[in-house]
């Protein structure tokens, strides 16, 4: 049955349709907003025995044909997911996963395919809404729906589903997943927004989502399939009670062990004790098929003990109260050859973070449906297995690492100086060396310190903190700076990053139905308190940005030339710029507006390159003195090159204070001499003088000499020695090339991103 429903949101129609495309999927919905269209399918297969996790995969796929483009590369087809697609996949996964039934372990796959892109409306939030609708109308057990809403603040007003152009101007940009009653996921950034402004944005998103939720419910009523019956497997009640009797008291003792490794060793011993006891009581054969359920029940008992300890006694696993921050240790400049480095440790979480400075040739090219863009600041987050005492194959970064890196990058990006203030490409790498919660926030704090250590003039220091929540019945506790166990066993992971003035990035995931405004406000208030504490500790280590760059960092010097002089620097086929690079060893980048960046760690090399560039683009200045080289001799004077490819005429009358009979008597080709620029006419012809730089003859003879020179100029040049008659013709001749032009340097400058060095 074909159904199409629409609702107006953000000033445009949001349309959901089903029953026309992908009818063999268990649920399929086409989402249209503007001319952007996303097809989302949901399929769930039979359960695989032996799984102890939920095998859900969410895939966001951009097809280049959606934007009228053909993929690059040899094969001319879409390959592996780009980073933006991975982040959009996570954006679907995070709010959808908690809404599946507890114990549901069937292979479930959600695929969002961008079929059309108008390059104005982003498809990520549409994919989330489409995934929710596809699951809701399918027979797959799921406790939705939710709706994805992008909220921006533009000129002080909140805007729903802002366009790509508007997002660039927004000082708040959030993606919010909303259910009927609550907010279930948040991801976004801001320009130092206050906590109250963030809450207002979240409430605006929740209000905006309600008509779309109505739309999904209407579609479910029209075409929804009956949900499959699902009953989560469970242990018999008597075995559950026996598990509690065996482990509860020991779990309480193990939970109070503050050292992570010792605590985990205690948990492992308890698991072994539980298995041995039940095996002896039930028999190995009877226990074997129940081992997975026994393991799950042990985790349930552990969660109950930890959560009760927090809500009843007000204490946490490591002995802290709800607001306390773990001990912090910071160190900077520990890697001598790195441009900027920092070691940040908070409790048992440790990261070493580096900053590397490069030139514009190191910018990252982003080629997506929205067009080609370039990033001059990027952050990479690594999480090696040894950081948690494990062994795993070393492969490329996983989705979690890419997501954590994007969050830390967003937190710092608004504090990076503009290119005209700091024309460097900046790469931060965070290596997690130890992890017991909040390693992404260690990347933010360490990244800020490494930027300051590198001499990057950031606008304000940034810190990050992860907040948690535990709700047991009518009691709840908001936790600052959560441990890994508090993240795993708790109900919320709420990361907040910002400066002393406000929030720059947030990320929130919850495992419960939703959060009230009161709990959100308390969490943000505690986060601000913790953030200021962490910033204080960071600034004790490095109060301000270092005034100088590392001696190993490239020095970028910027000069500006006229756009029509770019060809002089590039040369025919890039010959000139390649020659400068080969001669000096610098990196040179030329912008279309005439901005020239010269970079090298060797300041002398930069100076040599700049001298060459200035020489190539310099224009003769009237009254200035130049050391020139005689290029050509004529009977009326000499043509002297005073700047590269720029000649002027040194007339015979301007060679000396006395009458000159033959030019060759004063200068010869190849001679080097000082000359002064007398004038530059409209055609660019240059008149030079040597005479004005020579001392005047003294006394009466000098006066007569000046008089004779004046008469000589009035009378014209002497007769030719090599034949009868005078020179005739043009007295001035071609007096030099026009500044900035050369017959060998034709052709327009290349486009900005065609690298020139």
UniProtKB/Swiss-Prot annotation:
Residue intervals of the KH domain: 554-613
Cofactor(s) needed by this chain: Mg(2+)
Composition bias, Basic and acidic residues: 702-711, 719-757
Keyword Metal-binding included in the entry's annotation: yes
Keyword Metal-binding in record: yes
Substrates-to-products reaction catalysed: RNA(n+1) + phosphate = RNA(n) + a ribonucleoside 5'-diphosphate
GO cellular component, as recorded: cytosol
GO molecular function, one term: 3'-5'-RNA exonuclease activity
Segments forming domain S1 motif: 623-691
Places the protein is found: Cytoplasm
Positions of Mg(2+) binding: 487, 493
Region annotation Disordered: where it falls in the sequence: 697-757
Principal cellular location given in the protein's record: cytoplasm
Transmembrane segments: none
Swiss-Prot/TrEMBL keywords: Cytoplasm, Magnesium, Metal-binding, Nucleotidyltransferase, RNA-binding, Transferase
Database matches in InterPro entries: ExoRNase_PH_dom1, ExoRNase_PH_dom2, ExoRNase_PH_dom2_sf, KH_dom, KH_dom_type_1, KH_dom_type_1_sf, NA-bd_OB-fold, PNPase
NCBIfam families: polynuc_phos, PRK11824.1
Family that this chain belongs to: Belongs to the polyribonucleotide nucleotidyltransferase family.
Function: Involved in mRNA degradation. Catalyzes the phosphorolysis of single-stranded polyribonucleotides processively in the 3'- to 5'-direction.
PANTHER family reported for this sequence: POLYRIBONUCLEOTIDE NUCLEOTIDYLTRANSFERASE, POLYRIBONUCLEOTIDE NUCLEOTIDYLTRANSFERASE 1, MITOCHONDRIAL
Protein's name in the database: Polyribonucleotide nucleotidyltransferase
Organism field: Sorangium cellulosum (strain So ce56) (Polyangium cellulosum (strain So ce56))
Lineage of producing organism: Bacteria, Pseudomonadati, Myxococcota, Polyangia, Polyangiales
Gene: pnp
């Amino acid at each position: 049955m074909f159904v199409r429903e629409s609702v107006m949101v953000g000033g445009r129609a949001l349309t959901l349709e089903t029953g026309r495309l992908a009818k063999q999927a268990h649920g399929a919905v086409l989402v249209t907003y503007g001319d952007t269209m996303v097809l989302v399918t949901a399929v769930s297969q039979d359960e695989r025995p032996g799984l102890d996790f939920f095998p859900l995969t969410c895939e966001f796929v951009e097809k280049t044909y959606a934007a009228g483009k053909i993929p690059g590369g040899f094969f001319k087809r879409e390959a592996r997911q780009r980073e933006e697609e991975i982040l959009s996949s996570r954006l679907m996964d995070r709010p959808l996963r908690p809404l599946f039934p507890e114990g549901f372990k069937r292979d479930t796959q959600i695929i969002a395919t961008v079929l059309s892109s108008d390059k104005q409306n982003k498809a990520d939030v549409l994919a989330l809404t489409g995934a929710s609708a596809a699951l809701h109308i399918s027979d797959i057990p799921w406790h939705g729906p939710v709706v994805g809403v992008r909220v921006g603040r533009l000129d002080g007003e909140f805007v729903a589903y802002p366009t790509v152009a508007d997002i660039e101007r927004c000082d708040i940009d959030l993606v919010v997943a909303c259910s009927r009653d609550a907010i279930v996921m948040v991801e976004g950034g801001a320009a130092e927004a206050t906590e109250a402004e963030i809450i207002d944005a979240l409430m605006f998103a929740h209000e905006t989502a309600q008509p779309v939720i109505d739309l999904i419910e209407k579609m479910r009523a029209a075409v929804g399939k009956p949900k499959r019956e699902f009953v989560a497997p469970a242990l018999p009640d008597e075995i559950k009670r026996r598990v509690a009797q065996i482990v509860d008291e020991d779990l309480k003792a193990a939970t109070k062990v503050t050292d992570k490794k010792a605590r985990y060793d205690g948990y492992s011993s308890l698991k072994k004790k539980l298995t041995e006891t039940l095996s002896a009581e039930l028999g190995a054969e009877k226990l074997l098929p129940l081992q997975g359920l026994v393991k799950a029940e042990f985790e349930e008992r552990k969660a109950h003990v930890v959560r009760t300890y927090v809500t009843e006694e007000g204490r946490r696993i490591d002995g802290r109260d709800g607001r306390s921050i773990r001990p912090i240790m910071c160190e900077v400049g520990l890697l001598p050859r790195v441009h900027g480095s920092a070691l940040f440790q908070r409790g048992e979480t440790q990261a070493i973070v580096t900053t590397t400075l490069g030139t514009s040739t190191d910018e990252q090219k982003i080629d997506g449906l929205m067009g080609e863009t370039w990033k001059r600041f990027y952050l990479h987050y690594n999480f090696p297995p040894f950081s948690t005492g494990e062994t795993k194959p070393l492969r490329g970064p996983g989705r979690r690492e890419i997501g954590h890196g994007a969050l830390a990058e967003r937190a710092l990006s608004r504090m990076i100086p503009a290119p005209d203030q700091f024309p460097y490409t900046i790469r931060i790498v965070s290596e997690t060396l130890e992890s017991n919660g909040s390693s992404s926030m260690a990347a933010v704090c360490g990244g800020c310190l490494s930027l300051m250590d590198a001499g990057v003039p950031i606008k304000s220091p940034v810190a990050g903190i992860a907040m948690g929540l535990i709700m047991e019945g009518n009691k709840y506790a908001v936790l600052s700076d959560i441990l890994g166990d508090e993240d795993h066993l708790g109900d919320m992971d709420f990361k907040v990053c910002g400066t002393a003035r406000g929030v720059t990035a947030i990320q929130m995931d919850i495992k419960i139905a939703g959060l009230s405004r009161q709990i959100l406000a308390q969490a943000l208030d505690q986060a601000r308190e913790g953030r200021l504490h962490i910033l204080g500790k960071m600034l004790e280590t490095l109060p301000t940005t270092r005034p100088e760059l590392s001696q190993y960092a490239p020095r970028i010097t910027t000069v500006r030339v006229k756009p029509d002089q770019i060809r002089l620097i590039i040369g025919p086929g890039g010959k000139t710029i390649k020659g400068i690079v080969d001669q000096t060893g610098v990196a040179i980048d030329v912008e279309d507006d005439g901005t020239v960046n010269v970079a090298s760690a060797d300041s002398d090399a930069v100076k040599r390159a700049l001298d060459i560039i200035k020489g190539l683009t310099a224009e003769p200045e009237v009254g200035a003195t130049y050391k020139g080289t005689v290029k050509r001799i004529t009977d009326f004077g000499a043509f002297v090159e005073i700047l590269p490819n720029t000649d002027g005429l040194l007339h015979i009358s301007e060679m000396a204070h006395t009458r000159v009979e033959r030019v060759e008597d004063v200068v010869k080709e190849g001679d080097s001499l000082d000359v002064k620029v007398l004038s530059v006419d409209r055609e660019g012809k240059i008149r030079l003088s040597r005479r004005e730089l020579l001392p005047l003859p003294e006394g009466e003879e000098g006066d007569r000499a000046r008089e004779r020179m004046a008469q000589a100029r009035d009378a014209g040049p002497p007769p030719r020695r090599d034949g009868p008659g005078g020179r005739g013709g043009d007295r001035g001749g071609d007096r030099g090339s026009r500044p900035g032009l050369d017959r060998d340097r034709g052709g327009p400058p290349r486009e900005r991103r065609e690298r020139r060095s």
